[in-house]
Amino acid sequence: QENGVVGAGGAGFPTYMKLTDKANTILMNCAECEPLLKLHRQLLEKHAYEIMKTFHMIQETVGASEAIIGIKKSYVQTIHALNQHIEEFPGMRLHLLDEVYPMGDEVVLIYEATGRVVRPGGLPIEQGVAVFNVETLYNVYRAVEEHKPVTSKYVSVVAEVENPVTVKVPLGCTLEEVVAQAGGTTVKDPVYFVGGPMMGRIGNGSDPVTKTTNAILVLPKDHVIVMKKQRTSSIDLKRAASIC
């Protein structure tokens, strides 16, 4: 709480509040369902021991009997890194997931990994489960072991850039500044898409990086994804009505 650790994706739920819940199962989400994003698998591969150690610490803190790492079976290198340390942490196991969308959604992930169903609008803790993002766990590690607050963010910069890459940047820097770290754009009049192509939003080059910014997709303004996001709700409702 003192170091400002929140969920590093989604709604940015304060992490300390999850640590007060007595979950019997904790789940690490390493199932990036959005195309092109590689942030979590890369971070977990590079810092496997630190993140697993933190996950085990949380397991003991909340009194969970089981700690599950939900990871797509296609993340071979990351799985190899995890298997180097898994025996050091009793009660922790890997659950390999298929490469389907939207596996990274926590409700879907909970069902696939545990068989439990979270009701519509409900919270995972109602089913005795607490879910943690990979980068969130790494931030907890840095807060506990190194006493460092969250002042930076890992961001995947992909699509129409010179060198697609995952970078670590200070919170508050602009999207344009982050894209420059990937060598700049390769299209005229680029559109900055914050997040993945399925659930992301159109941003502005001057928008700041926040604690929940996971990715920046640079797309041409006439890309089908951009055009769909620019449709008004009335157009979408008309399409829905015609389909019905």
Where are these regions (language model features)?
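Hydrophobic alpha-helical positions that pack around
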Residues: 65-175, 181-186, 196
